[in-house]
């Protein structure tokens, strides 16, 4: 909400360091809590590799500790849905090993579409030149972006206006997925 209200405010993200992951994983190791970590997609961030490095260091110090780092393959709300279902699976009695396997298999069923309000984040992240974001903003360009089971983003189409972008998303969904409602 603060990003919408203050157009001058720019948020940036950075990958979590292996050291930070190590600290968190070590708390679970010391407590003896088997852990499954659903990580942001490797296709979009180096966080997954940092978590794997930390997991390897933890396993050297705590060889009996059960720790599984799973690439959730899902940016945005799909990651939240996967995490919520993982909690249900864990509560139904899955072991950490079984839960990691379930999560690794389940994320291949996730696929999503979205559009952006502005192109500024793409320019700030170096995905498009700032001039393209500026011109695109003036022309009310809205990209239709999808992500696949590996979490990789791809441009599906470019629309003029949010309504057209949302219609394109709905049409792509109808064209590519069968559903019973």
Regions found by a protein language model. Name each.
Residues 12, 37, 69:
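Short catalytic-loop micro-motif centered on adjacent basic/acidic residues
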Residues 20-48:
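N-terminal glycine-rich phosphate/adenylate-binding segment common to multiple enzyme folds
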Residues 18-28, 53-57, 169:
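Short, charged beta->alpha transition segments
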Residues 1-20:
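N-terminal glycine-rich anion-binding loop in soluble enzyme alpha/beta folds
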Residues 1, 43, 47, 51-57, ...:
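Mixed-charge interfacial surface used for oligomerization/domain docking
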Residues 13, 17, 35, 95, ...:
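Residue-identity detector for threonine
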């Amino acid at each position: 909400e603060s990003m919408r209200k203050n157009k001058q405010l720019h948020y940036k993200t950075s990958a979590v360091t292996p050291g930070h992951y190590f600290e968190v994983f070590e708390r679970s190791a010391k407590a003896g809590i088997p852990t499954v970590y659903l990580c942001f997609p490797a296709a979009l961030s180096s966080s997954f590799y940092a978590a794997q490095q930390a997991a390897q260091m933890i396993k050297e110090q705590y060889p009996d500790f059960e720790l599984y780092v799973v690439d959730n393959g899902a940016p945005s709300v799909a990651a939240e849905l996967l995490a919520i279902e993982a909690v249900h699976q864990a509560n139904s009695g899955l072991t950490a090993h079984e839960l990691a396997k379930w999560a690794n298999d389940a994320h291949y069923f996730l696929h999503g579409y979205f559009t952006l309000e502005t192109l500024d984040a793409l320019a700030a992240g170096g995905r498009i030149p700032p001039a393209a974001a500026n011109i695109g903003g003036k022309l009310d360009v809205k990209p239709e972006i999808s992500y696949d089971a590996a979490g990789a983003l791809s441009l599906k189409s470019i629309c003029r206006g949010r309504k057209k972008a949302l219609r394109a998303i709905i049409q792509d969904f109808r064209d590519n997925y069968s559903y019973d409602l």
